[in-house]
Amino acid sequence: MDNLRKLNLLSVSLTIIFVSLTIATNLPFFEVKYPNNNPFGMLLRPTPIKNQSLGLPAHVGSDECRVWTKACSDEILRLTYQPDNVAWLKRVRRTIHENPELAFEEYETSRLIRSELDRMGIMYRYPLAKTGIRAWIGSGGPPFVAVRADMDALPIQEAVEWEHISKVAGKMHACGHDAHVTMLLGAAHILKAREHLLKGTVVLLFQPAEEAGNGAKNMIEDGALDDVEAIFAVHVSHIHPTGVIGSRSGPLLAGCGIFRAVITSEDSRGAANLLLAASSAVISLQGIVSREASPLDSQVVSVTSFDGGHSLDVAPDTVVLGGTFRAFSNSSFYYLKKRIQEVLMDQVGVFGCQATVNFFEKQNAIYPPTTNNDATYNHLKKVTIDLLGDSHFTLAPQMMGAEDFAFYSEIIPAAFYFIGIRNEELGSVHIAHSPHFMIDEDSLPVGAAVHAAVAERYLNDKHS
């Protein structure tokens, strides 16, 4: 037993010496593993130096970039536009596009991401929110800044005829989340090569179920924002020309909610009043915005569904109506929610009827407005202009679309921005959620570079 213990201790000592020499001589690193949690039975598994397959050395970047200059931005662009790197970005995006997965079903997408992170030597935690990933690059200490990408596809049959069309019937990446994942992996590749320059930690969040509305909330509940002090994210835009970044300070995307009202009458003779009561309620709902909202504060209430039965000679015993509401501030948004319930219940009450209103809050169907913090927006704008030039940054208009990135922006300073994919020659002009939606892949390296520069420079600025 004593001889065996001495032999094991000798093995440990030799391992430590070997690893030390490996690091000192910059030889391929050997990863230490402990089988069965036994420190006296270590195995050595050779691991190649990361990033070599894409033509990047393990560490890239001058120490002069510890104080940011235009040369540092140019260095990131040079790394991004290496031919092997651009080709890799396209391969990754096309693989994800061919294999779309719906909310909380992104198992193969997540597997691909983890495979790429493993290849780059990037640490991560998995799973969060069922299929999500929290990876990190840098010192491992504060400050922590996050960049997020969503992973899920939509239940849409792709109508674009091209070599890499969706292989899954009835499912399609029709909102660009395949590009979002690719851009964040591209940023990870750049940041890993420049890890020795990072004055803190960059957190990479790969999030499921943006389209379902509760992916972000579940990620937060599972610790995605632990220690994080600011967060950034991008979304492709068919409005902006390829490679142009658009954003604005303050509210950028609207808060969005849905509602459904079931109208009934306890009086059997009141059935004839149900349609009249419901119709009156619809008209009154339209008056909330036109009569109560400021014309300078954009709000929307729309009734989009009305079911009053199908028989032509029998009055219904129930009428169901529903719709959506949107606003750019929390105060206006929740005022609309309150007034919708009041108007529905009071208006049908005039006709002796009752209304039960459901806002589907338990199903996470309410998104708050997505609001950009002034400081994070200004940081994004400064970094983008230094990286790409004045012509590649534009003030984006407020949009009535909604995004569950809003849940992050409610907790910490955030900046959400658009990257242009519009290219009329390619036919990349269709709105998201269209079966004809496609992107100009020239946007991929731009998004990767902006992500990387925004994150690295955020850490730099915190220490300046």
UniProtKB/Swiss-Prot annotation:
A biological-process GO annotation: response to jasmonic acid
Gene Ontology molecular-function annotations: jasmonyl-Ile conjugate hydrolase activity; metal ion binding
Entry keyword set: Hydrolase, Manganese, Metal-binding, Signal
A matching Pfam family: Peptidase_M20
Reactions it catalyzes: a jasmonyl-L-amino acid + H2O = a jasmonate + an L-alpha-amino acid
UniProt superkingdom: Eukaryota
E.C. no: 3.5.1.-, 3.5.1.127
Positions that bind Mn(2+) 2: C175, H177, H235
Enzyme class per UniProt: hydrolase
Binding site for Mn(2+) 1: C175, E211, H433
Signal sequence extent: 1-24
InterPro entries: Amidohydrolase, Bact_exopeptidase_dim_dom, ILR1-like_Hyd, Peptidase_M20
Matching NCBIfam families: amidohydrolases
Family: Belongs to the peptidase M20 family.
Function: Hydrolyzes certain amino acid conjugates of the plant growth regulator indole-3-acetic acid (IAA). Also hydrolyzes amino acid conjugates of jasmonic acid and 12-hydroxy jasmonic acid.
Protein's UniProt name: IAA-amino acid hydrolase ILR1-like 6
Organism lineage string: Eukaryota, Viridiplantae, Streptophyta, Embryophyta, Tracheophyta
Gene: ILL6
